Amino acid sequence: MMTAGTLPAQWQAAFQRDRQSAPVSGADPLPERRAARLLAAFILSGLAYLALPGTFLGVWNLIEIAAHRTAAGASSAWIQAHGHAQVFGWVGSFILGISLFILPKVRGAPLRSLWLGWLTWALWTAGVGWRWGCGVGLHGWRVGLPASAILELAALGLSQFLLFFPSSRRPRRRPKDLGSLLGIAGFGGLAAALIVNAMAAFRTAAANAIPQYPARLDRMTVELALWGFMLPLAWGYSTRFVTIFAGLRPPRQRAATGLGAGVMALIALLLAGQFALADGLAAILVGVAAWALRIFEPSAKPAKRLGVYRHFPAFIRLAYGWLAAGAALELAANFQPALGGAARHALTVGFVATLIFAIGPRILPAFLSSRELFSARLMAASLWLLAVGCLARVASEAAAYSGAAGWAWKVLPASAFLELAAVLLFVANLALTLAQPPPAWFRPETMGGETPLYWYISSYPRTRRLLIASGVKTLARTRDVPRSLTLAEAAAAEGLDADVLVGHLRTFFRQRQPRRARA
């Protein structure tokens, strides 16, 4: 590596300008790219938990249940491990990653520490994976269950430190909007769920012969994760993403305090074990949330459909329809317990999964270095397969577990395979989206020699190799690049023609044009 004194004169002068706080045209793209990389890690680990420990294990469990024609046909420990991977491994990873990426931007302050963000990802991913492994028979589960619970709590603590204590010293305003209050309540619900999960883990490790949580603590953990964490945060993020991309009218902000307080009351009821009262309150909150978000009201603007499946707003409304159905089934399950499984599936797959399948392909590629969704057709196929599979699953599970229809046991496995196909298409679509290089959302002709060299290599790291091959040898000998050094100055430092470098870069960016621009 070169020292400052051995750098070309143009580089030394640019570093001197930087030290004197000379202005640099354009925002610094490097922090954005690094934050997107952290988000990509959360998304990829979430997709892995969705496809393998989550859905695949769930299909296996359902096949066992259908074969024995009883809900007790599959291992309860395996079912609990599957549920944990789905709720915390998939949805939890998505929510934590998106929160660490988007909330600092909303506040206008960068993430306090990217390193702590990566530590959060490592602790969370390891904790969820260890918990799943213990449930399916991993050796040493008596140590693994409590240890995994501690890792998950540590990850949550780190994430909240990063989110609620930003690096900016500017005075913070008290959050009053609907999205913020629901987010605060939702993370409170996650904390409650993880604390109960830790209690169950320690009790199971100390007293049980198998890695199976006591039924009451397991139900409390799941209900807290669902009603206290996933649903409030889904509503909170709907105020931003669903409203904008589906073209809805602005949310009714006057519902913020009541809905936030209602979620906290619901969490308190669940912690007290008052499940029937909690179900009644949950049904009321569902109605209030749908009213506040204006989900079923006519859109005020055209939906933003470019690059995605054009009917995705209909599936967002379908998701909220499933939410209402799930809340009704939860209430009914207090009188007919056999409906409990169908109710939970309507909420987790019907609402949560459908909402993510509908809005995720619209927002995640944009967050991940402004990529394009790989395929709108794969998005459409995953949504339709999920919709049909979920309908078949909820109907057949309610009928089969109630003992009302023998045919339902044959439909159950088929519904599972439909949902598995939907999940695999969704995972493949997002994975292929991530595998694509970020496109250049500008005309190559607009780039020239006066653009900072730092912008090129920070926004599109592969241009570093291109520029080195084109003769900018200093880039090969130093890692740091002065932010005010223009491409023309870098060319002069090497005795190169700046127009030749610009031509090479324009060829590079022509090959990176978005598909819709090339069509």
Q: PLM features: residue spans?
A:
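Hydrophobic alpha-helical transmembrane segments of multi-pass integral membrane proteins
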Residues: 2-443
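Initiator methionine at the very start of the polypeptide chain
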Residues: 1-2, 519
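Compact, charge-rich alpha-helical regulatory domains located at protein termini
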Residues: 442-518
